[in-house]
Amino acid sequence: MLPLLLPLQLLLLMVMKGGHGCQGPELDRELVLAKVRALVLDALGPPNASKDGGKPVAQRLTRRHAHTGGSTRRSMENEDEDLSQVILFPTTGPGCEDEPEARAAEGLFTYTFRPSLHTRSRQVTAAQLWFHTGLDKVGAEVHNDSGPMVTLLAMSSGGPMAVPILLGPAPPHWAVLHLAAPAFTLLTRPLLVLLLRCPNCPCPAQLDATPFLVAHTRARPPSVGERARRSPLPPPWPWSPAALRLLQRPSEDPAAHADCHRAALNISFQELGWDQWIVHPPSFIFHYCHGGCGLVPSPVLSPGAALTPSQPLPLGPGSRPCCAAMPSTMRPLRVRTTSDGGYSFKYEIVPNLLTQHCACI
């Protein structure tokens, strides 16, 4: 029996430290907010102050896009669109020391890219290949008597195929190759092999001269069948402010919350004072464990039997059970933050924040 008590006591200490439980019969909203603040700050750290005096994100983004001719309403709608920018570095490149002289004179460089599963699952809206040419001006020497100076090929099952590109403005010693829309599907491959031909370009041996791909993506719109599956069923009751208040505060009946249960609280980041830092989601449902356990007898388990979330864990003699989250059932909260007022965003995760199952532990 003694070898079994030690891991159970350690489990109890872990739950009392990290779980959301062991609260009194009445739980104040400010106490829950303070707990959420501590968990978020412990995971993300304190927010960075905006360099422009903390101007509202919506106003700054609207002003930034005003010169494009779009309406303010359209700019506000674009803020909620799931956009991302990915930079891909090659996993393998040409070995400049071992490069054959014939290929080096031809200026043919081979690079292998491995787009992530996240990138392949999204819709590419723009893509550029940045390549270090070592030349001051590439745009003036794009065409010569023998044809284009920089060409791009992609390996396929049928052999190399030409990739349509457009040479755009670039800093000195670099070339920016904008891929045409038909070439966006290349980034949906798990393995992408590009062959770049630049006869007058030296082999980029230095690390800061490594080429890279820049992909702008957005969430792929769901198909008709997916939209039908994802469409939530209408609630059996009409939504009203009274229903929202039920989520924001516990029931007035103490008996309904006397036993151990999973409670819910609607928390907005504006209420926490972080709406200029955490911009998405604007609010979330915080689940936590609440209620008493009473005098719950320890269950007698047969060898190999598993506990269910509704069963109390066996404790040592004299131990008092606590209503807390079941270990390994906490879920993270994914948020999008900004530290410069909306000019750039960062996707972050607050781990072990949302309770899934409660039990008397």
UniProtKB/Swiss-Prot annotation:
Positions annotated as glycosylated: N48, N144, N266
Residue(s) at site: Cleavage: R64, H65, R230, S231
One Pfam family from the record: TGF_beta
Protein modification: Proteolytic processing yields a number of bioactive forms, consisting either solely of the mature alpha chain, of the most N-terminal propeptide linked through a disulfide bond to the mature alpha chain, or of the entire proprotein.
Protein biosynthesis found in the keyword field: no
Propeptide intervals in chain numbering: 22-64, 65-230
A single Gene Ontology CC term: extracellular space
Keyword terms: Cleavage on pair of basic residues, Disulfide bond, Glycoprotein, Growth factor, Hormone, Secreted, Signal
GO molecular function, one term: cytokine activity
Signal peptide: 1-21
Disulfide bonds: C260-C323, C289-C358, C293-C360
Keyword Glycoprotein set for record: yes
Cell location: Secreted
InterPro entries tied to this protein: Cystine-knot_cytokine, Inhibin_asu, TGF-b_C, TGF-beta-rel, TGFb_CS
Biological process per Gene Ontology, one example term: hemoglobin biosynthetic process
Segments of this protein annotated with the region Disordered: 45-82
Oligomer status and interactors: Dimeric, linked by one or more disulfide bonds. Activin B is a dimer of alpha and beta-B. Inhibin A is a dimer of alpha and beta-A. Inhibin B is a dimer of alpha and beta-B. Interacts with TGFBR3L; this interaction regulates female fertility.
Purpose: Inhibins and activins inhibit and activate, respectively, the secretion of follitropin by the pituitary gland. Inhibins/activins are involved in regulating a number of diverse functions such as hypothalamic and pituitary hormone secretion, gonadal hormone secretion, germ cell development and maturation, erythroid differentiation, insulin secretion, nerve cell survival, embryonic axial development or bone growth, depending on their subunit composition. Inhibins appear to oppose the functions of activins. Inhibin A is a dimer of alpha/INHA and beta-A/INHBA that functions as a feedback regulator in the hypothalamic-pituitary-gonadal (HPG) axis. Inhibits the secretion of FSH from the anterior pituitary gland by acting on pituitary gonadotrope cells. Antagonizes activin A by binding to the proteoglycan, betaglycan, and forming a stable complex with and, thereby, sequestering type II activin receptors while excluding type I receptor.
Family of the protein in this entry: Belongs to the TGF-beta family.
UniProt name for this protein: Inhibin alpha chain
Gene from which the chain derives: INHA
